[in-house]
């Protein structure tokens, strides 16, 4: 159903002959036919939800999730910078819950993008006795981020980190081929990995503060608590 030529992408990176590659591919896959399966529309949650899963565990696992932009959304670049600011060890929430208060044994900000929609948020691992306090602090910090925004230095450092990691990750032919393949499958051009840095470079402080206000909405947050009850 899904493994069809209409759904397949072949990406090749390296010192190769186009003529030889075409002849080889024609010989291997000639006659392989099948129907086209279009990308489906993802369902989204646009209202506040609180979910608790009672488990007998030593620690509780908390997630504060928000709707985010997809791969084809122009907001994705500013959100990627936002993610870089908040996910590092120097991030504001990490500082409050790990450095100033030893409340979280694990903490990270995440950003997962699908085709036309994404999800982002905060994961926190903590003691069950601290769940209420961690909830309060996390929500308070989110409100501060939305209200006060970030600094030029935070945005500059986050952009440099993203760009540096990108150039390092694209040093092998295998990585380039994989990027070309996935980008083509998502409806973007195979050379997207070359233009992505330009999009990141254009992100401004105002862009990052704007997407923080747009997406980090506590009234549309999905809160999940997996673990025991105090």
Where are these regions (language model features)?
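Extracytoplasmic/secreted cell-surface and envelope-processing proteins
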Residues: 18-22
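Carbohydrate-associated surface elements
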Residues: 15
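C-terminal hydrophobic structural anchor segments
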Residues: 156-187
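Surface-exposed aromatic
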Residues: 192-195
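Short, Lys/Arg-rich flexible segments
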Residues: 147
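Non-catalytic beta-strand/loop surface segments
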Residues: 1-6, 27, 31-73, 84-136, ...
């Amino acid at each position: 159903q899904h493994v069809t030529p209409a759904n397949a992408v072949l990406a090749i990176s390296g010192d190769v002959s186009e003529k030889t590659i075409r002849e080889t591919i024609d010989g291997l896959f000639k006659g392989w036919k099948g129907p086209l399966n279009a990308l489906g529309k993802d369902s989204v949650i646009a209202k506040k939800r609180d979910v608790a899963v009672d488990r007998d565990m030593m620690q509780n696992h908390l997630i504060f999730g928000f709707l985010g932009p997809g791969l084809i959304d122009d907001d994705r670049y500013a959100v990627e910078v936002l993610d870089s600011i908040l996910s590092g060890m120097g991030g504001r929430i990490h500082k409050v819950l790990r450095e100033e208060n030893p409340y979280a044994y694990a903490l990270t900000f995440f950003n997962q993008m699908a085709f036309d929609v994404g999800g982002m948020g905060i994961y926190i691992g903590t003691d069950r006795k601290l769940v209420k306090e961690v909830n309060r602090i996390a929500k308070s910090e989110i409100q501060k981020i939305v209200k006060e925004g970030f600094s030029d230095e935070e945005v500059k450092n986050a952009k440099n980190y993203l760009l540096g990691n990108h150039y390092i990750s694209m040093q092998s032919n295998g990585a380039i081929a994989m990027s070309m393949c996935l980008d083509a499958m998502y409806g973007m051009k195979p050379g997207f990995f070359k233009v992505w840095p330009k999009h990141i470079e254009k992100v401004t402080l105002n862009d990052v503060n704007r997407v923080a206000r747009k997406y980090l909405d506590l009234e549309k947050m999905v809160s999940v608590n997996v673990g025991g009850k105090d």
